């Protein structure tokens, strides 16, 4: 099996990136959903939850760098033609989902990484890169904004992944062509390709989808961040109104905080 792509087949490197990314993404989705639903009412439960989130974050950073390498490789390779290029609507949808997935591989882990860098003290990333990012302050507004973007873009990733898998199954079961087989190990037998129709429409559509998702995610997160930054005036007023004859003459107070993370 050749390492590089041709006009009709995917090479070994592209297949490796494809299946490595698929394994990481499916693992991350399962980890994120499972860890989010775990209780944290005891110290043992909190430690377990934090450990799973550390694993989730560490694999997420891994996906980010794998995605960058995959995208760079893809731009150096010819893209095999579509086997259903003569079905304009279907090929447009397939290409749009393809570009949405590429965006997901960068935006979802990056949003999560920025959310982590802006937060304090929970579930560290295990890569030796530190827990902060340049130009990202420890700030609850930034934390909430990119946390919401991570959730919204993650849902978009799951939706695009479902469509991608459904399309592959349709090609294999209904159309009975080599779309799925040529991404598997070995050399798939591929017949003559139909005439290819190159268009910017899928890229434009995917860009519009991502602009909308980013706007919604950041908008929701900024609203949550501003609410959390506001003090509780009723509690402050209640404390100020408390009358007491106590006076501090002399003494010291020691406070030690241990955080699991940055």
Model-identified regions with their sequence ranges:
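N-terminal glycine/threonine-rich, aromatic-flanked beta-hairpin/loop signature
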Residues: 248-262
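Membrane-embedded alpha-helical bundles that constitute the cytochrome b-like, heme-associated redox core
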Residues: 1-237
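A glycine-anchored, Pro-Gly-centered beta-turn/N-cap motif
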Residues: 242-245
């Amino acid at each position: 099996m050749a390492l590089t792509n041709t006009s009709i087949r995917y090479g070994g490197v592209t297949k490796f990136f494809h299946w490595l990314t698929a394994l990481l993404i499916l693992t991350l989705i399962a980890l994120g959903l499972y860890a989010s639903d775990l209780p944290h009412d005891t110290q043992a439960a909190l430690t377990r939850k934090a450990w799973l989130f550390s694993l989730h974050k560490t694999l997420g950073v891994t996906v980010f760098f794998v995605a960058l390498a995959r995208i760079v490789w893809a731009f150096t390779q010819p893209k095999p033609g579509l086997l259903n290029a003569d079905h304009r609507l279907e090929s447009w949808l397939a290409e749009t989902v393809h570009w949405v997935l590429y965006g997901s591989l960068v935006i979802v882990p990056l949003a999560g990484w920025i959310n982590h860098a802006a937060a304090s003290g929970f579930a560290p990333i295990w890569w030796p890169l530190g827990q902060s990012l340049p130009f990202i302050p420890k700030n609850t507004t930034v934390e909430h904004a990119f946390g919401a973007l991570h959730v919204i873009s993650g849902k978009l990733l799951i939706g695009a992944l479902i469509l991608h898998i459904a399309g592959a199954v349709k090609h294999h079961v209904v159309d009975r062509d080599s779309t799925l087989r040529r991404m598997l190990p070995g050399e798939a037998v591929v017949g003559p390709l139909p005439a290819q129709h190159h268009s910017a429409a899928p890229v434009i559509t995917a860009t519009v989808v991502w602009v909308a998702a980013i706007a919604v995610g950041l908008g929701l997160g900024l609203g949550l961040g501003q609410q959390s930054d506001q003090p509780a005036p009723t509690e402050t007023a209640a404390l100020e109104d408390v009358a007491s004859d106590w006076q501090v003459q002399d003494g010291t107070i020691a406070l030690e905080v241990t955080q699991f993370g940055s």
